[in-house]
């Protein structure tokens, strides 16, 4: 089978394979597209937490992006972990040069086990310089609270935070509601033209490592294949929900989701 599209991932590596670039590659491949990578950091972690983070020299990150895209131009880009202000600025430089229009940003800030993956200066740079460059930003509730300096307890708060991100220059926002203690989980899509709330039953499991990475990569994949952005979000949420339901009970902590689940449910993604 020939890949449907080409996706460049700019993100950190997760040695346990559940999140980061490893989750991105699995997601993109399982949905039928071709994945390329630019590694921004190496995280030494397992399902119980992050032991340490090894930074990649920003110039080497830029080189990965430019050299790869010079040969194979991606249809879309997914951006994940950018742990420093310097890294963010080099990534902005690179995406300005390669001129890809479809860019999804997952503002990775805190690992599932609670470890911080980005510093305060980088958050300011992301707010001021990067958000306006991308097509969609996909924060979870803790990330949206940090980016907007607000408290989020319900759907109205999620919409309010999304509108702040629009004022920062975001074109579209998907605030993920998985951290709410609701039986029905809302994911809120907000643009300057509309608000759409996706509602799904909460799945009770500790095995949710990599759900944010998986969702943003799934959105990027559907979007890269020509699906409208809002529809891409809807399909990606379905994919992640099925991945969680068929989760892998690996490790002693937060186990990974099952990226191979799409093989069984391809009819959903038409």
Give names to the regions the model predicted:
Residues 2-9, 29-112, 116, 266:
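Conserved N-terminal subdomain of the carbohydrate kinase-like
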Residues 22-25, 146, 205-229:
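Short, small-residue alpha-helix embedded
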Residues 4, 55, 230-270:
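Charged C-terminal helix
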Residues 17-33:
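N-terminal basic/disordered segments at the start of proteins
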Residues 120-195:
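Conserved phosphate/ATP/ADP-binding segment of small-molecule kinases
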Residues 31-36, 222-236:
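Phosphate-handling active-site elements
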Residues 10-16, 195-209:
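Short pre-catalytic strand/loop immediately N-terminal to key active-site residues, enriched for Gly-Thr
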């Amino acid at each position: 089978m020939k890949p449907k599209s080409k996706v460049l991932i700019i993100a950190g590596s997760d040695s346990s394979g559940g999140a980061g670039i490893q989750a991105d590659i699995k997601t993109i491949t399982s949905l039928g597209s071709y994945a390329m990578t630019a590694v921004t950091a190496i995280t030494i972690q397992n399902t119980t937490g992050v032991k340490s983070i090894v930074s990649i020299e920003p110039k080497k990150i830029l080189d990965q992006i430019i050299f790869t895209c010079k040969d194979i131009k991606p249809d879309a880009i997914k951006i994940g972990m950018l742990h420093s202000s310097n890294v963010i600025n080099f990534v902005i430089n690179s995406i300005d040069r390669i001129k890809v229009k479809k860019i999804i940003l997952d503002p990775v800030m805190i690992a599932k086990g609670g470890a911080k993956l980005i510093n305060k200066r980088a958050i300011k740079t992301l707010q001021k310089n990067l958000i306006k460059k991308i097509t969609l930003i996909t924060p979870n509730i803790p990330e949206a609270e940090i980016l907007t300096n607000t408290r989020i307890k319900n759907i109205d708060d999620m919409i309010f935070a999304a509108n702040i991100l629009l004022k920062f220059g975001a074109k579209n926002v998907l605030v993920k509601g998985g951290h709410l203690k609701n039986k029905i989980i809302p994911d809120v899509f907000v643009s300057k033209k509309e608000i759409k709330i996706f509602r799904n039953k909460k799945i009770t499991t500790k095995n949710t490592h990599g759900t944010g990475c998986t969702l943003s990569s799934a959105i990027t994949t559907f979007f890269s294949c020509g699906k409208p952005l809002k529809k891409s979000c809807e399909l990606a949420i379905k994919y992640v929900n099925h991945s969680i339901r068929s989760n892998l009970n690996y490790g002693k902590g937060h186990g990974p989701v099952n990226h191979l689940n799409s093989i069984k449910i391809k009819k959903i993604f038409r």
